[in-house]
């Protein structure tokens, strides 16, 4: 038995299919409304999914970090050694990396100058990735310089860089993966280079993932701060922080716009179904006269609406998939990202919405046709 | 026992301020294997009476008995079930569904009964009304007489006790009308069905067993009994 034969065992489907075929132009136009609605919902949804995916991959490097600076109620101008020791005692499952910061001007032999921020840190490996090789876990001599700064100044690995009257040999170049940039270049030196500063400007805690980072942040906040007194300012970027919240708002707004077009489409379906049931009033009267039940007429007309929605939805989903591949290629550079659930889900939702909206639009015409008294309907 | 019986039936319509009695204390009955013709000028209440007999409408006063059961106060859904199982309709302008083939149109009343396969009976009925070579034609590919025969086959698909025909020859030429009437006469015996036909076509009286003449909602003459 073929699929068609199987479907023909459902009289509502058979009748609905034949009825839709009677006025093909009208069916196609109504389905077109649904197609446009589905494509707008799906492609807007997939665009936000692509943006979100791209943003999270870029935020990934700081998402698992806790950043601690001196709080507004602190007596000192930084984080003290004692506080760092306490943190190390409290936090056992993450790397605690205290840093001293400053800024300086680095110049090259040819006289070109670049202003960079200076970070004094021992465990450089926890914070930096180098273009080649590994950053040292104990940076005791030598320096690391951002790749872009090095390129600008013509400095290569092994060249000396001066800071505070001392020369440091560049041991490695820092790979700048962070799209959010934090401005210019960075010079990383041993902690001893900034020894005239008593306190740490920043303590970074590097955890395994953003959930752990958030947990650690909360734990430290509870230990060091009270409601009235902020000894330390503790920041986490977990859950992609504010950026994630913004993206969620954006995606909701875009989906709402897509939703409006689907509402318009379902009004069109309501209109088409209403017109076609009014036109076929006499015919439905015949059905009722020969003993077709009200529920069966209702089902037949609802099936018509559902078929129209499914037809439009299916075409809409196929077009959206094509659009999604293009969108993902443009935003993330990987078209297959559209097939991952984060993007693909919008195709499922789009199709579901199309069918549900169409059925909802069919309810009133179907109810009206089914409850028309056969003796009235027969008069046409 | 009569298969359908109207007793003292009154049907009134409200038309603005005015109340019109379309049927005024009408009695009627029909037996299996009998053809009864209701005849009268237009506006005499023929169609209203046929709607009562066909359980499409309910009387304002009086009772309707189907096969000895009082169905006067049945709900719309109960009436639908009775029509489905016991009554067949033939309409003046055929009322075939244009997107269905002849066979599918005949199957239509039992379409939602997936428990029974009426396909063979539909084809058999079409063969018996002489349309064995038109099984898969659509209504627009059939002549008026052929369409009416499809409609008759459709009315018989559920093996009804009563077949109602509203002006069955109204849209047909003289010769085709006679063929249809011969067909109906044969079927009432073969299928042991009561045929109730409404017409203003005097030609039908040659084929009928009894005639009810209706004027202004009142039965003026019953002949042939």
Where are these regions (language model features)?
Chain B
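Catalytic Walker B motif of ABC-type/P-loop ATPase nucleotide-binding domains
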Residues: 163-166
């Amino acid at each position: 038995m073929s699929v068609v034969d199987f479907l023909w065992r459902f009289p509502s489907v058979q009748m609905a299919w034949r009825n839709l075929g009677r006025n093909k132009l009208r069916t196609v136009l109504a389905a077109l409304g649904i197609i446009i609605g589905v494509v707008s919902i799906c492609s807007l949804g997939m665009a936000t999914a692509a943006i979100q995916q791209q943003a999270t991959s870029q935020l990934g490097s700081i998402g698992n970090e806790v950043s601690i600076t001196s709080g507004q109620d602190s007596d000192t101008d930084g984080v003290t050694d004692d506080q760092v020791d306490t943190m190390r005692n409290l936090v056992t499952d993450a790397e605690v990396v205290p840093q001293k910061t400053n800024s300086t001007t680095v110049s090259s032999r040819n006289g070109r100058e670049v202003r960079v921020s200076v970070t004094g840190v021992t465990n450089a490996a926890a914070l930096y990735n180098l273009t080649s090789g590994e950053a040292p876990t104990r940076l005791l001599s030598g320096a690391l310089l951002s790749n872009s700064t090095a390129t600008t100044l013509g400095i290569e690995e092994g060249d000396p860089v001066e800071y505070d009257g001392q020369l440091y040999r560049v041991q490695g170049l820092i790979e700048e993966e962070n799209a959010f940039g934090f401005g210019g270049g960075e010079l990383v030196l041993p902690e001893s280079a900034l020894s005239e500063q008593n306190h740490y400007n920043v303590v970074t805690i590097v955890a395994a993932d953003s959930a752990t980072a958030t947990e650690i942040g909360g734990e430290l906040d509870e230990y060091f701060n009270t409601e009235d007194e902020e000894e330390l300012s503790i920041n986490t970027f977990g859950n992609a922080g504010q950026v994630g919240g913004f993206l969620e708002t954006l995606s909701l707004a875009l989906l709402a716009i897509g939703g409006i077009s689907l509402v318009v489409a379902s009004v069109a379906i309501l209109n088409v179904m209403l017109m076609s049931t009014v036109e076929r009033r006499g015919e439905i009267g015949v059905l009722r006269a020969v003993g077709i039940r009200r529920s069966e007429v209702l089902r037949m007309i609802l099936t018509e609406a559902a078929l129209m929605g499914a037809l439009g939805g299916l075409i809409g989903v196929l077009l959206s998939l094509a659009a999604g591949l293009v969108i993902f290629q443009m935003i993330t550079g990987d078209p297959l990202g559209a097939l991952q659930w984060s993007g693909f889900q919008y195709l499922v939702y789009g199709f579901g919405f199309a069918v549900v909206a169409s059925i909802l639009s069919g309810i009133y015409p179907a109810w009206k046709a089914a409850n028309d008294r056969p003796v009235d309907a027969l008069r046409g | 026992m009569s298969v359908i019986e109207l007793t003292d039936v009154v049907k009134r319509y409200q038309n603005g301020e005015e109340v019109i009695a379309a049927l005024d204390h009408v009695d009627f009955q029909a037996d299996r294997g009998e053809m009864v013709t209701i005849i009268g000028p237009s506006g005499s209440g023929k169609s209203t009476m046929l709607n009562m007999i066909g359980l499409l409408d309910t009387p304002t006063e009086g009772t309707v008995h189907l096969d000895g059961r009082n169905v006067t106060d049945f709900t719309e859904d109960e009436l639908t079930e009775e029509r489905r199982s016991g009554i067949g309709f033939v309409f003046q302008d055929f009322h075939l569904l244009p997107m269905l083939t002849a066979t599918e149109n005949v199957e239509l009343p039992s379409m939602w009964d997936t428990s029974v396969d009426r396909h063979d009976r539909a084809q058999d009925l079409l063969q018996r009304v002489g349309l064995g070579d038109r099984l898969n034609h659509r209504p627009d590919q059939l002549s008026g007489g052929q369409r009416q025969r499809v409609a008759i086959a459709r009315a018989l698909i559920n093996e009804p006790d009563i077949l109602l025909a509203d002006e069955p020859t109204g849209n047909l030429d003289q010769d085709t009308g006679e063929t249809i009437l011969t067909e109906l006469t044969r079927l009432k015996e073969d299928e042991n069905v009561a045929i109730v036909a409404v017409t203003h076509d005097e030609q039908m009286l040659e084929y009928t067993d009894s005639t009810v003449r209706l004027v202004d909602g009142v039965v003026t003459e019953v002949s042939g009994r």
